[in-house]
Curated annotation (Swiss-Prot):
The keyword Zinc does not apply. It comes from Bacillus subtilis (strain 168). It is found in: Cell membrane. GO terms for biological process: establishment of competence for transformation; peptide transport; protein transport; sporulation resulting in formation of a cellular spore. This is Oligopeptide transport system permease protein AppC. One of its GO terms (molecular function) is transmembrane transporter activity. Belongs to the binding-protein-dependent transport system permease family. OppBC subfamily. PANTHER family: D,D-DIPEPTIDE TRANSPORT SYSTEM PERMEASE PROTEIN DDPC-RELATED, OLIGOPEPTIDE TRANSPORT SYSTEM PERMEASE PROTEIN APPC. Its main location: membrane. The chain crosses the membrane at residues 39-59, 103-123, 138-158, 165-183, 212-232, 269-289. The keyword Protein transport applies. CDD domains: TM_PBP2.
Length: 303
């Protein structure tokens, strides 16, 4: 007697395909991202830096403000891994605490600017007309002003401080995100699923945030990752010029400002070297991760 062969019904096969699709998309993303060795290296280094900043009070061998004039300009060694500064403060400890400030400014500023830019860009791209014209003219005006001039002007008005810097970067950093999101919405608003949602009477805010926005998240995530590195670099530049984070709060930028004396750079080379290396390494790692995410989230790579 021949064995009965059962085949799954079309409905069962459809359910199986639907349930497997998200897993397949995730797998494709990870395969693409993991092939970028620089992105993986950048992610690992960033994880170490972030964890070191979070647990700085447990890792730092000395309090960040502990001074010892007898240990002034002490070279790197077992007692002070990265040497000391002009007040005898341990540079390694100050770099760990400075990472907390620089990363806080970077992440908080990007979250705020991404939220503002996404909302305004979505409104401009979806409604077009007068809404689009007004928002884009504001974007053009802000982008027409040199970044460093605009930042220094706002810092002078609001006065330096961590919270003030975050606010300033939010107010100046949303424009590129708004332009990016607007472009995505202009290309997605005429898709079939959006037209179908309009036809059945779906509310406008639900179409924007539930139907269109999820399909524009890829470029937004990539932009946010790259912007963190840019904000950290800008904060360091402002602090180096004396317009950013002010002592006694440690940041990588004001540590470089303390070491800008030519004699210090020659005789105590470790003083400017290590803060500069951490700024460079962190910005590069964010760029590496951003490039990896851009390649992995490219729709051409997800079939």
């Amino acid at each position: 007697m021949s064995e009965l062969q059962t085949t799954p019904s079309p409905e069962i096969r459809l359910k199986e395909n639907i349930s497997k699709k998200p897993e397949t998309m995730t797998k494709i993303f990870w395969e693409k991202f993991s092939k970028n060795k620089l992105a993986i290296l950048g992610a690992v280094i960033l994880f170490i830096i972030i964890m070191s900043a979070v647990f700085a009070p447990l890792i730092a061998p000395y309090p960040q403000e502990q001074q010892s004039l007898l240990d002034k300009y002490k070279a790197p060694g077992l007692e002070h891994l990265m040497g000391t500064d002009k007040f005898g403060r341990d540079i390694f400890s100050r770099i760990l605490y400075g990472a907390r400030v620089s990363l806080l400014v970077g992440f908080a500023s990007v979250v705020g600017s991404i939220l503002i830019g996404t909302v305004l860009g979505a409104l401009a791209g979806y409604f077009r007309g007068i809404v689009d014209a007004v928002i884009m003219r504001v974007v053009d005006i802000v982008l027409s002003i040199p970044d460093i001039f605009l930042l220094i002007t706002l810092v002078t008005i609001f006065k330096p401080g961590v919270d003030k810097l975050i606010l300033i970067f939010c107010l100046t950093g949303w424009t590129t995100t708004a332009r990016l999101v607007r472009g995505e919405f202009l290309s997605l608003r005429s898709r079939e699923y959006v037209l179908a949602a309009k036809t059945i009477g779906t509310k406008t805010h639900k179409i924007i945030f539930s139907h269109i926005l999820p399909n524009a998240l890829g470029p937004i995530i990539v932009s946010a990752t790259l912007k963190v590195g840019s904000v950290i670099l800008a904060e360091s530049a402002l602090s180096y010029l004396g317009f950013g984070i002010q002592p006694p709060i440690a940041s990588w930028g004001n540590m470089l400002q303390d070491a800008q004396n030519f004699t210090v750079m020659i005789q105590a080379w470790w003083y400017p070297l290590f803060p500069g290396l951490f700024i460079l390494m962190t910005v590069l790692c964010f760029n590496f991760v951003g490039d990896g995410l851009r390649d992995a989230l490219d729709p051409k790579n997800i079939k």
